[in-house]
C-alpha cells in the first residue's frame, strides 16, 4: 500500500508540475503568435508626428495582412521605405492612389480641394510642392509636425509602395522620457 502512495505521489507531483507550467507556457505561445503575426510594435524616437505622437512613443498596430480593409486618408501607419534602411517610419497617409496632391504656401490641396488637417498644431512652413499624382498602389505620407518631419515631400521617391506599409497604428503610449533622461 505504501508503494502505491509513493507512485501516486510521484504521478500527482508530475501532474501538478505540468498544470503549474501549462498556463504560463500556453499564454507565452499565444502572445508570441499574436505579436509575430497579428500586431506590430514600434518605438517612435522623433517628434515628426507631434502632437499626435509625442516622442518617445510606443505604438501598437495591426499588420496589413491581418487587417481586412483598405487604408484611408488620415490613417497613421508604420512602413518601410525603399532606401536600403531597415527601420520603420510612422507617418500619416495624406495622398491616396490616384490623388493629385499639391502644397501651396504650406496648405495641402487634394484633387484641387483644400485639405483640412485639424491635427496640426502650427501652420506649416511656406512650402510649395507639386502638383503630383499619386501612382496606383502608392501613398503620400506626411508627419503631423510639418516643420520637423522628414517625409514624402523631401524623399527622392515621394511615394511609398502599398506593399511597404506594414501596419495601421491603433494604440500609442508616450513613454514619459524627456531628451535629458
Question: For the regions a protein language model found, what residue spans apply to each?
Answer:
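Short beta-strand-centered aromatic/proline hotspots
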Residues: 89-94
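Short strand-turn-strand beta-turns centered on an Asx-Gly dipeptide
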Residues: 110-112
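Acidic loop->beta-strand submotif enriched in PP2C/PPM serine/threonine phosphatases
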Residues: 121-137
Amino acid at each position: 500500500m505504501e508503494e502505491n502512495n509513493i507512485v501516486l505521489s510521484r504521478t500527482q507531483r508530475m501532474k501538478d508540475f505540468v498544470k503549474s507550467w501549462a498556463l504560463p507556457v500556453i499564454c507565452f505561445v499565444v502572445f508570441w503568435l499574436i505579436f509575430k503575426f497579428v500586431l506590430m510594435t514600434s518605438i517612435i524616437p522623433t517628434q515628426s508626428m507631434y502632437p499626435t505622437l509625442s516622442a518617445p512613443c510606443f505604438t501598437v498596430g495591426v499588420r496589413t495582412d491581418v487587417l481586412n480593409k483598405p487604408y484611408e486618408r488620415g490613417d497613421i501607419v508604420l512602413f518601410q521605405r525603399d532606401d536600403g534602411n531597415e527601420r520603420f517610419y510612422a507617418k500619416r497617409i495624406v495622398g491616396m492612389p490616384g490623388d493629385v496632391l499639391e502644397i501651396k504656401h504650406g496648405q495641402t490641396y487634394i484633387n484641387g480641394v483644400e485639405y483640412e488637417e485639424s491635427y496640426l498644431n502650427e501652420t506649416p512652413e511656406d512650402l510649395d510642392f507639386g502638383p503630383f499624382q499619386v501612382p496606383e498602389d502608392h501613398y503620400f505620407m506626411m508627419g503631423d509636425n510639418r516643420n520637423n518631419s522628414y517625409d514624402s515631400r523631401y524623399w527622392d521617391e515621394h511615394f511609398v509602395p502599398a506593399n511597404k506599409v506594414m501596419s495601421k497604428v491603433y494604440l500609442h503610449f508616450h513613454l514619459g522620457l524627456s531628451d535629458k533622461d
